[in-house]
Amino acid sequence: MQYSSRFYISWLASAILMYASFVGWHGFFLNDLSYITFSKPLFFGLAGFVYLVISYVLYRVYEAKIFDRYFYSAVLRGVTAGFIIGVILFAIIAVLGISFTKHVNTTYLLADCLWQIAEQTIGGVVIGFGKLFLFEVRSEADYGD
């Protein structure tokens, strides 16, 4: 499978913006990055890699053929893909991480769910704008799937 420059630009821009919003939310608003007990450069490096993977999966969900029937707007398609990935990530995080933490209440879970949806929706919108505004000389269909 070959990818176009539209893919790479949208993928990287989405990952960078989601990573920046992650750092803003957890580093400045919640200030819970200060509780990390191991190497911060290692943590941020791994987080960067994770956001590259999340952005790739988000792009692939955005490109799902089933969306062709229901969404003609690139941005609405990005919002929908971001919502789906946000809910899935919240479920994974809730099962693997939050469930082992003490003092987690419903308000915290709701806020975390809404944040995951918002963060991934930001990434989906960036991908949608990339698909909308980045010009490709060759059609992406020429690259195959």
Give, region by region, the residue ranges found by the protein language model:
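Juxtamembrane/disordered regions of integral membrane proteins
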Residues: M1-D145
